[in-house]
Structure formats: structure tokens, C-alpha cells
Amino acid sequence: MRRSKLEMYIDILKVLARHGSLKLTHVMYKANVNCSVLKQSLDFLIQQGLVEEQFFSEKRNRRVVYAITERGRIVLRYFRELDIALQITGETSKIPALLY
């Protein structure tokens, strides 16, 4: 079953909250999102202030990693509370409590 954009955004935020700063390919594999969709999603999350790009220079290479912001963590908390309050799926929450 295909994920909605909201579910994809939440999955990306969860990955960054759980693993810290990650390169694009690491986010791609851990969130199970293809590269072009991930780039669009990260652009949106960056515009919303939920994710930030961090740049590092290593000799000749410039490395970019992505990290969740404090605002992104707050959004994850609100989403978890909403999921619990509404019991939308009748399943256990998809967002592990250890992130909060």
C-alpha cells in the first residue's frame, strides 16, 4: 500500500530523530523512499523548518547531511499525540515512544 505524503514526511522525521544527522543516501534507505521523492520531501521539510541541511568540507569534497530541527521534534510529538488520541488505525502507534 502506498504511503501518503504526510506518512512519508513523518517517516523521514522519525529516521532523522532516531539516527541523527545523515547523508541523503542513508535517509533514503532507512526511510524507504526513492531519491527523487526524497529530495522533494526534504526540500519541503527544510522550507517548513523541520529539517536542516548541514555542510561539511572534507579535503576536496563538500558533504551535506540532514538533521531534524527542534521544530521537527515538536511536530513528531504532536503527531504521536494525535495518533494516540484519535486511535486512527486501531493498531499500536507507528511512532515509537522512545523518540519523545
Model-inferred region functions:
Residues 21-30:
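Short acidic, hydrophobic short linear motifs in intrinsically disordered regions
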Residues 52-58:
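Short Lys/Arg-enriched helix C-cap and helix-to-coil transition segments
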